[in-house]
């Protein structure tokens, strides 16, 4: 049993070191600035050193606060601005579930990679449409 514990501990150290050494060359955007994003997702992205170029939210009042909180990040209310930026390779989406389908549709049409919180949509018909878009644009969806 002692050997198994040593092996598990060794693997955990290796995994943590590997995560810290990973260097992301691409830039990403994040849509949404709610409690779940702030408490769970942004800290993980920071820990993994994922370079965010944009944070998008509905409220223009929050834009200066976002830029002050996240150095080097451009805050915007425009998803289209993000999707037009060729430097952005992927978009993380964590908004109200009712908005997921519309945002995911635009991201997939742009050809960018998409990470979307569950549920990605609100009906089987919408899911079928998202899957068709994913195939048509050869997009990565997580």
Residue ranges, per PLM feature:
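Short acidic low-complexity segments
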Residues: 74-86
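Structural motif corresponding to alpha-helix initiation and N-cap regions
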Residues: 38-39, 60, 76-79, 124
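Short, Asp-centered acidic motifs that coordinate Mg2+ and/or phosphate
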Residues: 54, 74, 89-90, 140
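N-terminal Rossmann-like dinucleotide-binding module
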Residues: 1-70
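Short glycine/serine/threonine/alanine-rich loop segments
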Residues: 50, 72-73, 112, 139
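Beta-strand-loop-alpha-helix segment that lines the small-molecule cofactor/substrate pocket
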Residues: 90, 96, 101-142
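Active-site-adjacent beta-strand anchor residues
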Residues: 31, 56, 93-94, 117
